[in-house]
Amino acid sequence: MKIDIIISADDIVESRVRNKIAVIIDIFRATSVIITALDNGAREVIPYLTIEETLEYAKKLSRDNYILGGERKAVKIEGFDLSNSPLEYIKEKVEDKTVLMTTTNGTRALTKSMEAKRVFIGAMINGESVAKKLININDDVVIINAGTNGNFSMDDFICSGYIINRILDVNRNIELTDIAKTACMIYKENINILSYVREASHYSVMKSLGLNNDIDYCIKKSIIDIVPEYKDGKITCE
């Protein structure tokens, strides 16, 4: 197994994902939302790049069967049911529903990863389970950080390091690219995630919007066991 990291959605190129196992990470907050929604019983999550695409697909469904969720610049989209806060995706709202989702960074990373052999959804909240999944598959991995508006994101990067460290706890015989080694070392030096992500630009944006509870939730380690998979345009659990 060899592990690489792509630092933002803008840096995704086919040659780096083709025939590899991809893990998409956007801990603040798209992948945390997806994992939480499915863990709380959502039937599936379907990501879209644009608001228009999301609303167009919604026309094909019965209104009782879907939830519109997403954000632009970390703020809920007008007319949507839910924002991009994982704390909103409770069982009472999402159980047996299709979640139609569009976000600034996470959905871009997902839709640009289609050349991968398989695409999984990762975050701090399911990091241990992601590591176990990758160990069992035992194939080359690329961890794709959604980033922030095409730029490197500290929060996604340290989550990558967390997952890599969990893999190394089980199997030290893993080849890491230099950037994967760097993420691994950064996590080891910042096991208290909050003290590290406080320096991230995305943290500052969320803090300014009063999203403290979202921050606290998204940096929790391995509180959910599922590992959603993106396939044929939809995200589901096995």
Curated annotation (Swiss-Prot):
Pfam families: 2-ph_phosp
SUPFAM superfamilies: ComB-like (SSF142823)
Recorded catalytic activity of this chain's protein: (2R)-O-phospho-3-sulfolactate + H2O = (2R)-3-sulfolactate + phosphate
Domain of life: Bacteria
Matches recorded under InterPro entries: ComB-like (IPR005238), ComB-like_sf (IPR036702)
EC number: 3.1.3.71
Cofactor needs: Mg(2+)
Enzyme category, top tier: hydrolase
Similarity comment: family membership: Belongs to the ComB family.
Protein's UniProt name: Probable 2-phosphosulfolactate phosphatase
Gene expressing this chain: comB
